[in-house]
């Protein structure tokens, strides 16, 4: 990208950006929630739309001069509705967390009971963690996975729901590698007359391309981020049934946000258009193929995969049998140029700052053009680095750099 002005006005900051650019260019990015946006997304994000205040919604603003940003937001909303066949869309949430907060506030009261997935079983902070606003403002209770299969225990979920009769059931996850049965959860919600909310932030790209069943026909509310598998700017969005549209919109503004970030909404519109194209479907199909191959190769090296494998874009790995913690594995792999994140596993015995596992995903490397053969090499690099962690691993780091050179991030930037 062109940094001519920044070079003159703030070379100190530009130096930091350049170092991060180099890190992204020469490292294998396996954090499941990260991706590389297109240059078009970045151009929209860096446009002069950032100058415009636009409190309110299209054609009902609290500021003048909004006729063109109204067009931008309308375009983003219509594209998002088309992408997921939804009745209503709100593209103003600054993040997935704020999208979740807005849904809770739209139909619930402080202190109401909500049933969500346990964080250590694959849920998310905003699904009831006691350190998060969700756990502080609402009475969250948790469901999790079966100890044997390590997949969602729907019988347990139903039992807890019948015993506690929550006002809402939240599904979706940040570290769950299997298909989620939204139809079954809808049936449980109907039995206790509860709202159904799905946080599909991680799997939105899979849902958009038919590689994961859509929650939209079943859920009252669906939230998502626009980065991760959707490959857009950092931000959030909400889909809902038309009957909840006013409540959701009011919860975002004036409920928890002021002016929307119009440059980000423009970038969201770009990514929704990209996700409607046929080549995006091919990309997501390759993501799933890559994840499955990477998982099988790691299993061949003796790594234990939570639930035994994956149906989506990510793998959760229990490192106990490798005699290394998630924290140490993250640091070790980072030293050779593979970026992962430490992650708790179901029935975790270690602190969330240490963890027994790591979470990895393939959306970012697939965006670069990596395919099955590269997945086999990544599995080899990971295994070799962990098995030979007391040795000099400079040759592995060099091999990783060479692979990255074959798949440059932004060839024409």
UniProtKB/Swiss-Prot annotation:
GO terms for molecular function: glycine hydroxymethyltransferase activity; pyridoxal phosphate binding. Keywords: Amino-acid biosynthesis, Cytoplasm, One-carbon metabolism, Pyridoxal phosphate, Transferase. Belongs to the SHMT family. This is Serine hydroxymethyltransferase. The keyword Amino-acid biosynthesis applies. The keyword Amino-acid biosynthesis applies. PANTHER family: SERINE HYDROXYMETHYLTRANSFERASE (PTHR11680), SERINE HYDROXYMETHYLTRANSFERASE 1 (PTHR11680:SF35). Homodimer. One of its GO terms (cellular component) is cytosol. Pathway: One-carbon metabolism; tetrahydrofolate interconversion; Amino-acid biosynthesis; glycine biosynthesis; glycine from L-serine: step 1/1. It comes from Clostridium botulinum (strain Langeland / NCTC 10281 / Type F). Gene3D superfamilies: Aspartate Aminotransferase, domain 1, Type I PLP-dependent aspartate aminotransferase-like (Major domain). It is found in: Cytoplasm. Pfam families: SHMT (PF00464). Signal peptide: none annotated. Catalyzes the reversible interconversion of serine and glycine with tetrahydrofolate (THF) serving as the one-carbon carrier. This reaction serves as the major source of one-carbon groups required for the biosynthesis of purines, thymidylate, methionine, and other important biomolecules. Also exhibits THF-independent aldolase activity toward beta-hydroxyamino acids, producing glycine and aldehydes, via a retro-aldol mechanism. It comes from the Bacteria. Its EC number is 2.1.2.1. The gene is glyA. InterPro entries: PyrdxlP-dep_Trfase (IPR015424), PyrdxlP-dep_Trfase_major (IPR015421), PyrdxlP-dep_Trfase_small (IPR015422), Ser_HO-MeTrfase (IPR001085), Ser_HO-MeTrfase-like (IPR049943), Ser_HO-MeTrfase_PLP_BS (IPR019798), SHMT-like_dom (IPR039429). (6S)-5,6,7,8-tetrahydrofolate binds at residues 119, 123-125, 351-353. It catalyses: (6R)-5,10-methylene-5,6,7,8-tetrahydrofolate + glycine + H2O = (6S)-5,6,7,8-tetrahydrofolate + L-serine. SUPFAM superfamilies: PLP-dependent transferases (SSF53383). It is an enzyme of class 2 (transferase). Its cofactor is pyridoxal 5'-phosphate. One of its GO terms (biological process) is glycine biosynthetic process from serine. The modification N6-(pyridoxal phosphate)lysine is found at residue 228. The record marks 227 as: Plays an important role in substrate specificity.
């Amino acid at each position: 990208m062109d940094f001519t002005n920044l070079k003159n006005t703030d070379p100190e900051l530009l130096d930091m950006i350049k170092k991060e650019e180099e890190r992204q260019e020469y490292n294998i990015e396996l954090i499941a929630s990260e991706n590389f946006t297109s240059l078009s997304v970045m151009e929209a994000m860096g446009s002069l739309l950032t100058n415009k205040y636009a409190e309110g919604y299209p054609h009902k603003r609290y500021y003048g001069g909004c006729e063109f940003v109204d067009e931008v937001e309308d375009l983003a909303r219509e594209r998002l509705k088309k992408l997921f066949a939804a009745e209503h869309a709100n593209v103003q949430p600054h993040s997935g967390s704020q999208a979740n907060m807005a849904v809770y506030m739209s139909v619930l009261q402080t202190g109401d009971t909500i049933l969500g997935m346990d964080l250590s079983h694959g849920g998310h902070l905003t699904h009831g963690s006691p350190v998060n606003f969700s756990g502080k403002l609402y009475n969250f209770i948790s469901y999790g996975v079966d100890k044997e299969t390590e997949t969602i225990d729907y019988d347990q979920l139903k039992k807890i729901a019948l015993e506690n009769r929550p006002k809402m059931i939240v599904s979706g996850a940040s570290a769950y590698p299997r298909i989620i049965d939204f139809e079954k959860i809808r049936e449980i919600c109907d039995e206790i007359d509860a709202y159904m909310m799905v946080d599909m932030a991680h799997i939105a790209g899979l849902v958009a391309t038919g590689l994961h069943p859509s929650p939209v026909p079943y859920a009252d509310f669906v939230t998502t981020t626009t980065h991760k598998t959707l490959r857009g700017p950092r931000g959030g969005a909400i889909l809902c049934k038309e009957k909840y549209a006013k409540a959701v919109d009011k919860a975002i503004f004036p409920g928890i946000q002021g002016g929307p970030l119009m440059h980000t909404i423009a970038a969201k519109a770009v990514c929704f258009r990209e996700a409607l194209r046929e080549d995006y479907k091919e990309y997501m199909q390759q993501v799933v193929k890559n994840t499955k191959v990477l998982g099988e190769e790691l299993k061949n090296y003796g790594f234990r995969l939570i639930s035994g494998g994956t149906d989506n874009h990510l793998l959760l790995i229990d490192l106990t049998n490798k005699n290394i913690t998630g924290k140490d594995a993250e640091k070790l792999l980072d030293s050779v140029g593979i970026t992962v994140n430490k992650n708790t596993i179901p029935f975790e015995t270690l602190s969330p700052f240490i963890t027994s596992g790591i979470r990895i995903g393939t959306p970012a490397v697939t965006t670069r053009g990596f395919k099955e053969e590269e997945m086999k090499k990544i599995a080899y690099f990971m295994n070799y680095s962990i098995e030979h962690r007391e040795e000099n691993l400079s040759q592995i780091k060099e091999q990783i750099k060479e692979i990255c050179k074959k798949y440059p991030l932004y060839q024409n930037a």
